[in-house]
Curated annotation (Swiss-Prot):
It comes from Streptococcus oralis. Belongs to the RecU family. Keywords: Cytoplasm, DNA damage, DNA recombination, DNA repair, Endonuclease, Hydrolase, Magnesium, Metal-binding, Nuclease. Its EC number is 3.1.21.10. Binds 1 Mg(2+) ion per subunit. HAMAP family: RecU. Endonuclease that resolves Holliday junction intermediates in genetic recombination. Cleaves mobile four-strand junctions by introducing symmetrical nicks in paired strands. Promotes annealing of linear ssDNA with homologous dsDNA. Required for DNA repair, homologous recombination and chromosome segregation. This is Holliday junction resolvase RecU. The keyword DNA damage applies. CDD domains: RecU-like (cd22354). One of its GO terms (molecular function) is nucleic acid binding. It is an enzyme of class 3 (hydrolase). The keyword Magnesium applies.
Length: 198
């Protein structure tokens, strides 16, 4: 192997190993943006909103070495409700976040009956409840109030997806920014609270 100036090797470059597609964390970039937004709100004293942990029951753990324990069998203890909850200006906040690669709709299979029931219960207690929807292929993000999701869920049970047109008509578009990345509190304050705070 000969090194040329600027440390360029004469050896043929090997192609990087092919990567298999992993769809498990398909929504992670959107989730990371929400988490960064929530961190911003927390550090600036605007809101305290956290991601809810998923309740998991660990069944079996392998200990090949004491420092390398590996969970090999686990299951969900109970169905989780929504992704995030917290407090903003004395109001309870509860919301779900969904990302899709589809251009014109969000699949309704992403919303489970127990989640709809939970949202109904939050609204019955006068909490603020909504869904953040991100259309990755179009880079469009919306806040859809829970009442509109629930109405669609009950009226159109046979439909497999919620059209983007319905979301645009009933939701609020969020322009993505730098700090915070997803300024959803602006929508809550202006549209869901009518500009007033406590």
């Amino acid at each position: 192997m000969v090194n040329y100036p600027h440390k360029i090797s004469s050896q043929k470059r090997q192609a990087p190993p092919s990567q298999t597609k992993n769809f498990a964390n398909r929504g992670m970039s959107f989730e990371k943006m929400i988490n960064a937004t929530n961190d911003y709100y927390l550090s600036h004293g605007l809101a305290v909103i956290h991601k809810k942990p998923t309740p998991i029951q660990i069944v079996r753990v392998d200990y090949p070495q004491r420092s390398r324990a590996k969970i090999v069998e686990a299951y969900f203890r109970q169905a989780s409700t929504t992704d995030y909850s917290g407090v903003y200006d004395g109001y309870y906040i509860d919301f779900e976040a969904k990302e899709t690669r589809q251009k014109h709709a969000i699949p309704m299979k992403n919303f489970h009956h127990h989640q709809i029931q939970h949202m109904e219960q939050v609204l019955a207690q006068r909490g603020i409840c909504f869904v953040l929807l991100h259309f990755a292929s179009q880079q469009e993000t919306y806040l859809l109030p829970a009442v509109d999701l629930i109405r669609f869920y009950h009226q159109d049970k046979g439909q497999k997806s919620m059209p983007l047109g319905y979301i645009r008509e009933n939701g609020y578009r969020i322009e993505l920014g730098a700090f915070p990345q997803i300024p959803y509190l602006d929508i809550i304050k202006e549209h869901l609270l009518g500009g007033k705070t406590r």
